[in-house]
């Protein structure tokens, strides 16, 4: 019996070891996944996962793991279109997605002072962010994304501190239908009701809120 049990135990230990390696979220982030097509996240999002604003790569650090996991799934399925992320997500296993999403949530993220609907709203971007435009069925951004757009759980990601280029690109993707991974097309309806100038203004508002509060 020993001659049977020991080999089986060895195989089991090897499998567990392989799974542990595959589930090393930090390694996936900095070096890439088991599939060579799953390139290291840090290449575009930075070693600290704070993103690269000039290139339009968003901050990932501190974002809820459930949200990040869903985005990876959506890139893989095509519900969220991006020529860089789609092949990377397709090359990641479910286990690798879980691991890297958990790693991202644990990474340090900037803090932002709570800015809500009671604050003064000066300018187009601030008015949309804090008051909305209900006559056009545009709710204020902070109603869902939280004070200062800090993000709320797995459903509403942080807006504060993301680059204006990234935020504007996402709003335009919803307007154009290339991003369609929100429940009941909520963001699609909102984005399509906004003008080009409003998209730019609200994107710059949240980008600047982040810079002001983090001292950048």
UniProtKB/Swiss-Prot annotation:
GO terms for cellular component: periplasmic space. Keywords: Heme, Iron, Metal-binding, Repeat, Signal. Residues 23-108, 118-210 form the Cytochrome c domain. This is Thiosulfate dehydrogenase electron acceptor. Pfam families: Cytochrom_C. Acts as an electron acceptor for the thiosulfate dehydrogenase TsdA. Heme c 1 binds at residues 41, 44-45. GO terms for molecular function: electron transfer activity; heme binding; iron ion binding.
């Amino acid at each position: 019996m020993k001659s049977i049990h020991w080999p089986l135990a060895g195989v089991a230990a090897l499998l567990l070891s392989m799974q542990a390696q595959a589930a090393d979220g930090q390694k996936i982030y900095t070096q890439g996944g088991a599939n060579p097509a799953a390139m290291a996240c840090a290449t575009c999002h930075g070693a600290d996962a704070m993103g690269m604003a000039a290139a339009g790569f968003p901050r990932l650090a501190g974002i809820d793991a459930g949200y990040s996991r869903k985005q990876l799934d959506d890139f893989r399925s095509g519900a969220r279109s991006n020529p860089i992320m789609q092949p990377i997500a397709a090359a990641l296993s479910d286990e690798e997605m879980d691991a890297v999403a958990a790693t991202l949530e644990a990474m340090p993220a900037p803090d932002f002072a709570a800015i809500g609907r009671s604050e003064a709203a000066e300018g187009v971007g601030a008015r949309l962010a804090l008051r909305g435009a209900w006559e056009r069925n545009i709710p204020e951004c902070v109603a869902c994304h939280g004070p200062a757009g800090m993000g709320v759980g797995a459903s509403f990601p942080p807006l504060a501190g993301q680059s204006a280029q990234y935020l504007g690109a996402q709003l335009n993707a919803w307007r154009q239908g290339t991003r369609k991974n929100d429940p009941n097309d909520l963001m699609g309806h909102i984005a399509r009701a906004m003008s080009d100038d409003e998209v730019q203004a609200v994107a710059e508002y949240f980008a600047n809120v982040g810079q002001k509060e983090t001292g950048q």
